[in-house]
Amino acid sequence: MTIVLLDNRGFASIGGLSEAVGSGGFGTRYQYRNAATSELDGDALPVDLAANAASLGARVWRADTLASFREALAEARSEVRPSVIVVPVDREARVGGYDSWWDVPVPEVSTRREVQAAREAYDAARRMERDFL
């Protein structure tokens, strides 16, 4: 079994969704609490997912180029134990939009303008929903 682990230093996918609905991606980055602000916007936490995988018995490669990824994948194919290829990725990179909508409810009441705007967009999108059953 080969696992390709995309390391974005947090939970980037759910963070992007959280930001899209006005919640700012709370708690989706591996960061220390800032002593001055008490927010989770301090230095990066040193989470080593490769070391974690190795501690569980996996053979691990770190691939930061396409060439090193291809090499790791070729080696992993002949490995008899679980294999993990860790690929650091840009957590801010996003895929383009698409012509569909994911019904993720947004709070109806909030003091934050970002959430209020996201709720207005949510309500407008809900009005355009089509039932298929």
At which residue positions do the language-model features occur?
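Thiamine diphosphate
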Residues: 1-133
